Design a protein with these regions (language model features):
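Structured mid-domain segments that build the active-site/substrate or prosthetic-cofactor binding neighborhood
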Residues: 1-75, 81, 85
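Catalytic domains of carbohydrate-active enzymes that cleave complex glycans
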Residues: 25, 52-228
């Protein structure tokens, strides 16, 4: 298997559709082979799924909002805004998310959502600074968006330059934040999954800090490199 990085994607917004499909087709049980690690807000995913399996008529929005309020505490309002932004970004871009190939796993995150999402998460971290548990949960969710930004760092940077947008990201800052989030989570789990998490952390933190460049073919030697 390749290194599995979690999505910056709140999957619980689609759980009710899945449960309804099961009910409509008389499915009364199913088996989940692998949770693929504790992905972005997987605790909330499990909470919403469990309650809907017990009673499919429950209001999905109330379940999600109640879970977000309890899970993120003082940062709940900002985290709800962030999670809804990620949901809306995927729906807006109408892009299929693939399981393999790390670049394609983050193809639904665009520059605008990366910038706005980071601004919202800055506010969430500030709101949670007096609550250690909530702050660490914000950090753990944020590392999903940070992974997307690191994977597409130079692509986004070039786009920002072309569109005249201020470039707000610093690669070292993001790498340090990712490393801290993984270390906090390993402390919380008592080291469970250490090898996998360290592999993901090392992979992200080893991404090149300069863009990979190639020689321009002689046929294009009179072209501006920025246009190629």
């Amino acid at each position: 298997f390749n290194i599995r990085l979690n999505y910056a994607l709140p999957l619980f917004y689609r759980i009710k559709d899945t449960v309804n499909a099961y009910c409509e087709n008389n499915v009364n049980g199913f088996f989940i082979e692998s949770e693929c690690g504790d992905a972005d807000c997987w605790d909330i995913n499990k909470y919403v799924l469990t309650h809907l399996l017990e009673d499919p008529s429950l209001d999905e929005v109330e379940l999600i909002n109640g879970a977000i309020d309890r899970y993120f505490g003082p940062a709940a309002s900002d985290m709800r805004e962030y999670l809804e932004l990620m949901r809306d970004t995927l729906e807006k871009n109408e892009i299929k998310v693939l399981c393999c190939g790390e670049d394609s796993r983050f193809n639904y995150v665009d520059l605008d959502s990366a910038i706005k999402g980071s601004e919202i998460l800055d506010r969430a971290r500030e709101a949670a600074k007096g609550d250690i548990k909530s702050a660490k949960r914000v950090n753990w969710v944020r590392r999903c968006l940070d992974a997307a930004i690191l994977m597409r760092f130079f692509e986004f940077k070039d786009q920002a330059k072309r569109e005249g947008k201020t470039w707000p990201f610093d690669m070292k800052t993001i790498k340090d934040r990712v490393a801290t989030a993984f270390e906090e989570h390993l402390e919380f789990t008592g080291g469970r999954g250490e090898a996998s998490f360290n592999a993901m952390k090392d992979y992200l933190c080893s991404l090149p800090e300069e863009p990979t460049t190639f020689d321009i073919p002689s046929e294009l030697s009179d072209e501006n490199p920025d246009d190629i």
